UniProtKB/Swiss-Prot annotation:
SUPFAM superfamilies: Tetrahydrobiopterin biosynthesis enzymes-like
Protein name: NADPH-dependent 7-cyano-7-deazaguanine reductase
Active site, renumbered: C181 (thioimide intermediate), D188 (proton donor)
Source organism, top-level taxon: Bacteria
Summary of the function given for this chain in its UniProt record: Catalyzes the NADPH-dependent reduction of 7-cyano-7-deazaguanine (preQ0) to 7-aminomethyl-7-deazaguanine (preQ1).
Binding site for substrate: I81, E82, S83, H220, E221
UniProt pathway annotation: tRNA modification; tRNA-queuosine biosynthesis
Residues annotated to bind NADPH: S83, K84, R249, G250
Species per Swiss-Prot/TrEMBL record: Xylella fastidiosa (strain 9a5c)
Reaction catalysed by this enzyme: 7-aminomethyl-7-carbaguanine + 2 NADP(+) = 7-cyano-7-deazaguanine + 2 NADPH + 3 H(+)
Enzyme class: oxidoreductase
Keyword NADP: yes
Length: 275
């Protein structure tokens, strides 16, 4: 089984001069999920949406072409794709000739699907930069913070647990999220959004919980699944969606989304202003 310790992540490697799909490195999702009590039956649906900003190849006349692209990796794939390996793989197309851009798109889709162990959708272009109109920013809260890790789900609670609770639908977001790469220790910055329907969640507690990831080392996808599990278990919403929009590194950004139901949450896809 592949682990991140055997990948190119954290190692100096030469940039490829020719197309090489073997550069792609899969990491089993099962290992990280076992640590937070997720087994074979997943409590969520969703995807890891990648935005690629540095994609280039040669046309039939040898002229360089450039494009951006979006990749959709389903969360029920057995493997996630390690980010540095994806960067190197995409760079390996820089001297590869394609008569049509569609041929490149199909090649990338086939290679990423083989790496992830499930069908990966690939499209040229990026979502627009934007934001949710009804989002409530937690960053405005005037709170004292002293806990920066490990992630502490004890901060999560409902506002009124012993009263007749009224159900609400809220979209809560924070740009203050930071975690760290488990291999290199590099900081990973993100905007995190929690959308739910249920008994009101305590806003200050949720912000403190987000900030308790600040010294935590875990892959982007695993952080989002940990947040999903903790909020679901501690606050018991009837519907829940968690998405993190991580800032760009190496020409890529990662946007994991986990939700209780595809039908319950029509997702408005956009890029964060920091991406």
């Amino acid at each position: 089984m592949n682990t991140s310790h055997y990948s190119v992540l954290g190692h100096a490697v030469p940039y490829p001069k020719a197309y090489d799909p073997s550069l792609l490195f899969p990491i089993s999702r099962a290992v990280g999920r076992a640590q937070i009590g997720i087994g074979v039956v997943l409590p969520f649906v969703g995807e890891d949406r990648w935005h690629a900003y540095e994609l280039s190849w040669l046309d039939a006349r040898g002229k360089p072409c450039v494009a951006t692209a979006t990749f959709h990796v389903p969360c029920d794939s057995p493997y996630l794709i390690e980010s540095k390996s994806l960067k190197l793989y995409l760079n390996s197309f820089s001297a590869e000739v394609f008569n049509r851009a569609e041929a490149l798109r199909l090649r990338i889709a086939a290679d990423l699907s083989a790496c992830a162990g499930a069908a990966v959708a690939v499209e040229f272009g990026l979502p627009p930069v934007g934001g949710g109109d009804k989002e409530i920013s937690l960053d405005r809260l005037n709170v004292d913070i002293e806990d920066y890790g490990p992630p502490n789900p004890d901060y999560l609670s409902n506002v009124a647990q012993n009263l007749i609770e009224e159900m609400v639908e809220e979209t809560l977001t924070s740009t203050l999220f930071k975690s760290n790469c488990p291999v290199t220790g590099q900081p990973d910055w993100a905007s995190v959004t929690v959308r739910y329907f249920g008994v009101p969640i305590d806003h200050e507690g949720l912000l403190r919980y987000f900030i308790s990831f600040r010294h935590h080392a875990e892959f982007h996808e695993q952080c989002v699944e940990r947040i999903f599990q903790d909020v679901l278990q501690r606050c018991s919403p009837q519907c829940l969606a968690v998405e993190a929009r991580y800032t760009r590194r190496g020409g890529l950004d990662i946007n994991p989304l986990r939700t209780t139901s595809e039908m319950a949450w029509p997702i408005s896809v956009f890029r964060d202003p920091r991406q």
